[in-house]
């Protein structure tokens, strides 16, 4: 079974070909460098870039692969930026019509979950910590068609909090990889920020932690005290990761699952990956090349859904 996977939910244009869930081709063009100066994604510009990039990727794939041999076309339907999702939808329909292949709409978050299935076998039921710029969720997955959210952020997503803290500390965009790099090189003591508490046993709240960090920074400025930006950034990451891990452990104690999965763009965070694997011997993390948005995870999700039928 050969599946073309198309991902355009945010600022990465990515197309992959998977054959029996093995990656045959993966081409991705990121827009991150374009939006560094803006400190975030601008949807209108992103949509225009997707139009340009999706055609560039198509040219690359056509030179190397016979698209007529594809069995299915899968694309990200939701959630994401409306305009960028539309680009992927129109492209998927064009390929479907050109080659007379069935089209499969995929939920972006389910796609992230199945990024782990490319290199690992996922046993059900599974507990997933999904962490990204737009989402922070704990999900119970009984099969490819049965996803249950048992906890989620009530305000900022963890990736959004990283971006906002990074912006306030004038470190740049995107905040996740910048702060993670600082953390890996930091050897000092951590500031003891308070781990958040949210209503609901498995929910998250990152606005309070973000405010703690920003207030600490502002107070230092107002008192004209020395500021160690690296200490503040590293301490924020330490607290954020601890919070994610502790909430996951709490859910794992209640739910009898056969696999524990880390997914989403923030799964690229080095400390989160390390601590997640330490939780349990059933823990699975995605290969770094599948951690952020990519077409392979969309095709992999479609493959799992088709297998289940």
UniProtKB/Swiss-Prot annotation:
User: Per its UniProt record, what Gene3D superfamilies does this chain match?
Assistant: 3.30.420.40
Record-linked HAMAP family: TsaD (MF_01445)
Could you say which residues bind substrate here? Answer: 130-134, 163, 176, 180, 269
What's an example GO BP annotation here?
tRNA threonylcarbamoyladenosine modification
Q: Which GO terms describe its molecular function?
A: iron ion binding; N(6)-L-threonylcarbamoyladenine synthase activity
Domain of life per record: Bacteria
Q: Hey, which family's this protein in? A: Belongs to the KAE1 / TsaD family.
A Gene Ontology cellular component where this protein is annotated is: cytoplasm
Q: Which InterPro entries match?
A: ATPase_NBD, Gcp-like_dom, KAE1/TsaD, TsaD
Enumerate the PANTHER family for this protein.
TRNA N6-ADENOSINE THREONYLCARBAMOYLTRANSFERASE (PTHR11735), TRNA N6-ADENOSINE THREONYLCARBAMOYLTRANSFERASE, MITOCHONDRIAL (PTHR11735:SF6)
Q: Does the keyword tRNA processing apply?
A: yes
User: What job does the chain carry out?
Assistant: Required for the formation of a threonylcarbamoyl group on adenosine at position 37 (t(6)A37) in tRNAs that read codons beginning with adenine. Is involved in the transfer of the threonylcarbamoyl moiety of threonylcarbamoyl-AMP (TC-AMP) to the N6 group of A37, together with TsaE and TsaB. TsaD likely plays a direct catalytic role in this reaction.
State the compartments where it is located.
Cytoplasm
Query: What is the source species?
Result: Mycoplasmopsis agalactiae (strain NCTC 10123 / CIP 59.7 / PG2)
Q: What is this protein called?
A: tRNA N6-adenosine threonylcarbamoyltransferase
Q: What is its EC number?
A: 2.3.1.234
Residues bound to Fe cation are 108, 112, 293
Catalytic reaction list: L-threonylcarbamoyladenylate + adenosine(37) in tRNA = N(6)-L-threonylcarbamoyladenosine(37) in tRNA + AMP + H(+)
Q: Give the required cofactors.
A: Fe(2+)
Q: Which UniProt keywords apply?
A: Acyltransferase, Cytoplasm, Iron, Metal-binding, Transferase, tRNA processing
């Amino acid at each position: 079974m050969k599946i073309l996977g198309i991902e355009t939910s945010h600022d990465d244009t990515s197309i992959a070909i998977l054959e029996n869930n093995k990656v045959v081709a993966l081409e991705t063009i990121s827009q991150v460098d374009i939006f560094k100066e803006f400190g975030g994604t601008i949807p209108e510009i992103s949509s225009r870039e997707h139009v340009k990039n999706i055609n560039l990727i198509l040219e690359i794939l056509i030179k190397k692969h016979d698209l007529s041999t594809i069995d299915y076309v899968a694309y990200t339907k939701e959630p994401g930026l409306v305009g960028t999702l539309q680009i992927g939808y129109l492209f998927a329909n064009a390929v479907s019509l050109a080659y007379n292949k069935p089209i499969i709409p995929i939920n972006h978050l389910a796609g992230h979950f199945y990024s782990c299935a490319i290199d690992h076998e996922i046993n059900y039921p599974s507990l997933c910590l999904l962490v990204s710029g737009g989402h922070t969720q704990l999900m119970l997955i009984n099969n490819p068609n049965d996803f249950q959210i048992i906890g989620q952020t009530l305000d900022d997503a963890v990736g959004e909090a990283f971006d906002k803290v990074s912006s306030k500390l004038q470190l740049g965009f995107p905040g996740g990889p910048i702060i993670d790099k600082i953390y890996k090189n930091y050897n000092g003591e951590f500031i003891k920020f308070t781990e958040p508490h949210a209503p609901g046993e498995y929910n998250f709240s990152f606005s309070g932690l973000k405010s703690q960090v920003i207030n600490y920074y502002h107070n230092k400025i107002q008192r004209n005290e020395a500021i160690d930006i690296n200490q503040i950034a590293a301490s924020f990451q330490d607290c954020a990761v601890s919070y994610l891990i502790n909430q996951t452990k709490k859910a794992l104690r209640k739910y009898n699952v056969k696999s524990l999965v880390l997914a989403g763009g923030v799964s690229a965070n080095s400390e989160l990956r390390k601590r997640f694997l330490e939780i349990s011997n059933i823990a699975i993390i995605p290969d770094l090349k599948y951690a952020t948005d990519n077409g392979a995870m969309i095709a992999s999700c479609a493959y799992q859904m088709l297998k289940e039928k």
